[in-house]
């Protein structure tokens, strides 16, 4: 089975594969990246983009749900042993992914482009003790990686949570775009 994401959006395709209890590897190519979604009897149990295993399977799925153009192909078989299987149902992943996508799109107006550098100004505008643990983690990622996309990639939670933290840090002048 193969086709175009423009004709069958990824959420609709995954719902179809779930209800028909298909197994295999769904390869999705958006022209820039290649995503793979591993299915067992209609349930997503793993996913990756460009075989980058440092990004969680859930985060990879949520990111692929943003792809509006490209092609897909379902290849039978391809069972893979993984340490970090997705526990959520396919329907649960889709509902949460679409919700996060909507919220992330609303926040994007407040974010710089994904490839933008991020920096920590000196002196700091406030006290680090005023930050939440999650904001401190994001602050550390800005120090370590210095680019929005890398902060999102390395944040242990969702892209939405990381984006909310970056916006909060920027508003309070803990982080700037140089």
What is the meaning of each model-derived region?
Residues 1-178:
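Acidic, Ser/Thr/Pro-enriched low-complexity segments and adjacent helix/loop capping patches
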């Amino acid at each position: 089975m193969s086709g175009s994401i423009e004709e069958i959006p990824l959420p609709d395709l995954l719902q179809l594969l779930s209800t028909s209890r298909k197994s295999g590897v769904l390869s999705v190519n958006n022209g820039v990246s290649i995503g793979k979604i591993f299915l067992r009897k209609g349930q997503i149990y793993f996913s990756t983009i460009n075989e980058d295993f440092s990004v969680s399977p859930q985060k990879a799925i949520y990111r692929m749900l943003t792809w509006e153009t490209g092609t897909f192909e379902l290849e039978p078989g391809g069972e893979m042993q993984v340490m970090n299987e997705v526990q959520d149902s396919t329907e649960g992943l889709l509902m949460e992914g679409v919700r996060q996508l909507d919220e992330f799109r609303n926040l994007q107006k407040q974010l710089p482009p994904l490839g933008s550098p991020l920096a920590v100004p000196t002196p700091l505008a406030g006290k680090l003790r005023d930050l939440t643990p999650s904001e401190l983690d994001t602050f550390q990622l800005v120090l370590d990686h210095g680019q929005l996309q890398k902060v999102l990639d390395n944040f242990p939670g969702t892209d939405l949570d990381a984006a909310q933290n970056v916006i909060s840090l920027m508003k309070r002048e803990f982080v700037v775009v140089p």
